[in-house]
Amino acid sequence: MAALNMVRQGLFGEILHGGCGYEHDLREVKFNDGTHYNYVPGSGDLRMGPTAFAEAQWRTNHSVHRNGDIYPTHGIGPIAHCMDINRGNRFLSLSAMATQSRGLHKFIVDNGGENHPLAKVNFNLGDIVTSMIKCSNGQTIIVTHDTNSPRPYSLGFRVQGTEGL
């Protein structure tokens, strides 16, 4: 809300670019022991799907069956307001790409061993997905999705204009 207020007051000048995303280490949420919400370090009991608990029942399956930004709205909402999307501006084109998928497999091997049954799962979701959006009024947006890497939480929020960021 503060950044949107600053945009509306013209403090950034003409808006040129935005950055946003969902960058949150969810590896301990995507696997658990079937009774705890998060993975219990040192237990070696890693589950996903029907035998898991809470989000590990459904969230991890997206990492198996999809490859793309599976949660773009988390970050794009505030940027869309700042760029007047659906108020005279619109998304014109999008190009997205993903890195290879390594983080979840490494987490399984590091915590359950190379012979853990989940070590055989083929994860399709790239560890980092980057989407580039071009707006009809000329602005660009970079959206980043990263939930499979060891990292601090970040929405990567950035508004940049002719007068600064």
List PLM regions with ranges:
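A structure-centric signal for secondary-structure junctions around beta-strands
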Residues: 15, 91, 127-128, 153-154
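Predominantly a Rossmann-like dinucleotide-binding segment in NAD(P)-dependent oxidoreductases
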Residues: 1-122
